[in-house]
């Protein structure tokens, strides 16, 4: 349960969680006498299936919110109405605990019995942390603390706060992505130079180039997504599809909970073939945000529905490069004969059960009428259209 929780909240570091948490989870599991591959699966499921949930506002919130606002602006060019990065915050806080509980339960009662006791096949050697590396970690931690204090001072002195010291709509939230970027950059530099990994700026450049080399396909995909979104805005095709779709759904009486569940399942299905959450939302938002607005739903609510469909099947899509990284690590260190089918077949029950329970949780939340974020409900505010 703890590993599942750590994996879920790990998305504050975005995709880094998928790389770091599964190997660490394997070591923890092996340390308590459990099968390390199960630990990798639990850590991976938490980081992937629970990717959209967090106790804090993360970069994912800001990224999706920006795409949602672009869709609103394309639909109503003269509007000042926007959604905030916190528009799904309340719902996602409780979803974090839900994801951890469901993933933990599934791992204990469904995955662990399949693998049984670990017999020690494979090579799993834990390298000892050197004194220099410990100094690097201390330097990174100290840097993070100082940086957070500076940000807090900026907020409470009014530089990063909104009107009347408000958190919602503040420059702190609007600039969350660059703030997190600088935080991780400073921590990385502090560790690198203290631990001796970096000697000069050339070493930093080489490390950045090495990591960005694997992002080439994603950058290329983002380019075509940008062209797609630009063409949609120029031709107004998204608006036409939204109006036609909204009229058709309203005429058929297909609204409310059935519509919400159908949209969640659509996103869940497409996610198996296109694993990037931002890329899918860049395609979906120009169509579905206006469509749901015409049906009377808040754009933040539509974004929430997308996130509910986008997360659980992250764990089972073979299109994600991270599941292949988990497979390679498992084969190298713990189970030489494990295949991709074994991983997916064990992760599939987690994805399905989590999706079902999450949708039920959403329906209860929706029927009660609780806000999904500060000042955000399911209904579109009066006077927007």
Spans of model-derived segments:
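Interfacial loop-to-helix junctions that mark the boundaries of transmembrane helices
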Residues: 82-94, 131-137, 164-180, 250-254, ...
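Core transmembrane alpha-helical segments of multi-pass membrane transporters/permeases
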Residues: 169-239
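Hydrophobic alpha-helical transmembrane segments of multi-pass integral membrane proteins
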Residues: 1-26, 31-32, 219-228, 250-290, ...
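Juxtamembrane interface elements at the cytosolic ends of transmembrane helices
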Residues: 102-125, 153-163, 181-201, 327
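Short helix-coil transition sites and intra-membrane helix breaks within transmembrane domains
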Residues: 10-20, 55-59, 195-198, 230-239, ...
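Membrane-core helix-loop-helix motifs of multi-pass transport proteins
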Residues: 22-118, 304-308, 323-364, 370, ...
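Hydrophobic core segments of alpha-helical transmembrane domains in multi-pass membrane transport
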Residues: 3-8, 46-50, 91-109, 141-156, ...
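Hydrophobic, small-residue-rich membrane helices and short re-entrant helix-turn-helix hairpins
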Residues: 121-138, 163-167, 193-215, 336-345
């Amino acid at each position: 349960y703890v590993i599942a929780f750590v994996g879920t909240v790990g998305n504050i570091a975005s995709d880094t969680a998928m790389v770091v948490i599964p190997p660490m989870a394997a070591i923890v599991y092996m340390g308590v006498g459990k099968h390390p591959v199960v630990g990798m699966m639990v850590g991976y499921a938490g980081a992937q299936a629970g990717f959209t949930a967090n106790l804090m506002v993360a970069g994912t919130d800001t990224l999706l919110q920006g795409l949602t606002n672009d869709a609103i602006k394309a639909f109503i060019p003269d509007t000042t109405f926007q959604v905030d990065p916190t528009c799904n915050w309340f719902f996602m806080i409780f979803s974090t605990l839900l994801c951890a509980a469901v993933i933990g339960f599934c791992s204990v009662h469904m995955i662990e019995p399949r693998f049984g006791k670990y017999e020690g096949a494979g090579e799993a050697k834990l390298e000892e942390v050197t004194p220099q590396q410990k100094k690097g970690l201390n330097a990174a931690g100290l840097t993070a603390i100082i940086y957070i204090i500076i940000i807090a001072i900026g907020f409470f002195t009014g530089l990063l706060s909104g009107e009347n010291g408000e958190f919602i709509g503040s420059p702190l939230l609007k600039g969350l992505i660059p703030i997190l970027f600088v935080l991780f950059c400073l921590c990385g530099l502090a560790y690198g130079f203290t631990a001796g990994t970096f000697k000069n700026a050339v070493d930093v450049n080489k490390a950045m180039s090495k990591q960005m080399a694997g992002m080439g396909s994603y950058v290329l995909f983002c380019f075509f997504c940008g062209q797609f979104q630009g063409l949609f805005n120029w031709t107004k095709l998204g608006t036409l599809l939204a109006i036609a779709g909204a009229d058709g759904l309203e005429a058929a009486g297909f609204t409310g909970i059935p519509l919400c569940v159908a949209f969640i399942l659509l996103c869940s299905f497409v996610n198996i073939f296109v694993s990037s959450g931002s890329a899918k939302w860049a395609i979906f938002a120009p169509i579905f945000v206006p469509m749901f607005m015409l049906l009377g739903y808040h754009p933040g609510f539509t974004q929430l529905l997308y996130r509910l469909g986008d997360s659980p099947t992250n764990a089972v899509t073979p299109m994600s490069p991270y599941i292949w990284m988990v497979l390679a690590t498992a084969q190298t260190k713990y189970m030489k004969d494990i295949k991709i089918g074994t991983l997916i077949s064990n992760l599939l029950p987690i994805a399905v059960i989590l999706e079902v329970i999450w949708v039920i949780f959403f329906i209860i939340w929706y029927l009660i009428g609780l806000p999904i974020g500060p000042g955000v409900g399911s209904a579109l505010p009066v006077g927007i259209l």
